[in-house]
Amino acid sequence: MPEPTTDTPGIPEEEVAACVGAWWREGGRGDQVAFLALADDHDASAVVRDTHAHVPGSVVVDATGLTADQTMQQALTALGVDLSEDKREDWRFALGAWPEERLLLVVNAHRAGPTRRSHEPERLVTRTLRHLARGKLAVMIHVVPRLLPTRADPKTVFRVSAPATEPTVAPDSAALRALALAEPRLVPLPVWAQLVTALTGEAASEDELTEFAREEPGILRLGPLGVSFVDEGLAETLRRETESADLLRVHGHLVTWLMRSAPDMRHPEGWARRGAVGLYAATGLAMHAVQAGTYGEVLRDGRVIANLPQTALMDAARSITFRIPGNTAASDAIHLWGWGVTPRHQTEWASWLHLMALSRDDLEVASVIASSGVALPWQAKWAHWRPPGGYHARFLQPGKFAALTEVRWQGRPTIAGLQQRTVNGEQQLYVSIWDVETGDHVAGPWEYDEIPQEHRADLTWTASSGNGSAAPARVRELFAASSPRRDNRAFVLPCAPLAVGDVVVFAGDLGLIAIKPADGVDIADFGARLRPLSGDYTDAGPCRPIDAPAPSHEDLITLFGEDLLYPIEVEDFPDRLTHAATRELLLDFGLPYMNEGAMGLFPFGNWEIGILDELPSWPEGIDPVPESGPFFQIGKWMGGKLVIDGPTGHVLRVPTEPGQDHLAGLPVAHSLEAFLTMVALFVTGWRSRDSAPPASSEREQISYWVLGALAEVDETGGDQPAWSYVLHNT
């Protein structure tokens, strides 16, 4: 058979099926991706249908309007793969277990996604379908030239020559040109009228547009929910011919009109359930806003985002950039997607958006979401946790929870949490007490089995506990009847949920939150994880409290607690450490006692070193540094000594031997204050990464968030390889 390349003419349409059939019969095509490349306006349905007939056992999926995840779901279902909840993770094994190879044909990949500007076509072609081609399954994708990967093997590209047929003749009509600028492909008549008004500056009659559609049945299809093009290729051609100024004006007008119409689209289940216009707005508003340059404003409007699907928020953001800024509903959507939180109903998705806004203290947006008209099935009462995508010391303050039980503290309903933390490399259990109504931390941590004598009168059992005594005497009694922890892989917060009054408390390694369900709503499965078949969507920036000050050395108090920060005693302070700001910080604030992330800081020394041991000069054989010393050791890092230069206050890492350029850290920071700020950022990232799902993209993203944050504090020190070496190799 011919082997088409970029230098060879296209294959005549009538010969494509035979060429693909011959290619397939050669065998050994499993886990390959091939491409059927046709011109943008070329209808591929006949070509794919004929190809399907030439390859026995092949399956065809039309990607038009589908997300990459929906396309993958349809494909696997058509191939007979079991996608039931307990089997869906095994789809990769299923593809490799077939006795013979099979071919999946995906048509209209360039029309994937619910909107015309969607990023889904690129995602489908460059990522999703490549991951699907494995084992005994090969995938052939119908693409247009702009989507054909530049590194595609020419032997797997079947370029189809355009047929010698007359193109569709369409009337020169402003109404037709305006309709092509819609984002969803099915357009309600009121929306079409607004598109015409935006393009021409003149009012348009819905009756006249209806009559126009009826007069052009070969071009337009009229149905109960609106009008669409018979040949989507014509719409794509008209869009390409539109001036950029016209595009900006039309999209801006439509965003304004849809936002103004929001009160009329209110519905307990979201805009999409309020007629054709509501469905159009829910599907297309975000992408119109992208092209109007107002997507940032949309993301700050809780009334709007409560009605926009998770995929619409992600798709619109990704169509702008591959690096999605953090602290927005779009980044929330991406982080939750990566954790496997993909609610099926808009109402539940709005509840998650409310929780994420509340988690970063964006109370204004949370309040507007709650009053958006969407009937939230549950609302977060308070949240003390590291939300998916969270990167801030404050998010880590509540700690990790292993079990919960209900108690009373001074008569008030409270939660006792069995918690765990790592101290000097060892797991340590402790107990804390939390107020159910306010979420306040009211007592603890208690690190030993005995409940402190001074608190025994404050802590009592509930009246319904069934315990023989009025109050527990030991910590172990608190959790004797606790329900077992659920599967870590199946739930975001795997501790058994605990109902207290009108709220249900959930906890786990991420922290603790209280959820108030609506009447009659069962939220036992809150936080259930169902990882999307198509995998991670894209990278997004971190989530932080909106009122958080700039990073500071004082963040170490949040991370370690004041009891693990040790100022240096005056009598222990070396005279030759003369840098004034460094002396003041060490005497007043001190250093944390830590051994974490291959770094140890020892404010009172350890078995190897004393307090601020002096290193009189830089070791011989090690590349010299501008600092003259003497140097004073505060700890160790990746085997090397961490020292402070006495005259300048610079913090340096002393390599253990020559030739350690990949671990050089000179200087680590230009001041002790900057170094301690960087330590806080590093430890925050280290602990946050530990709480992310194994093998998740968030674990890798956190490493880059940390490196970026370090460079903002000290550009030179943050760029030193030892930071990244630890993050990427441990």
What residue ranges belong to the model's regions?
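P-loop NTPase Walker A phosphate-binding motif
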Residues: 21, 37-60, 142, 146-149
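Sensor-1/coupling segment of RecA-like P-loop NTPase cores
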Residues: 41, 123-154
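A surface-exposed partner-binding patch
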Residues: 512-517, 521, 527-642, 713-730
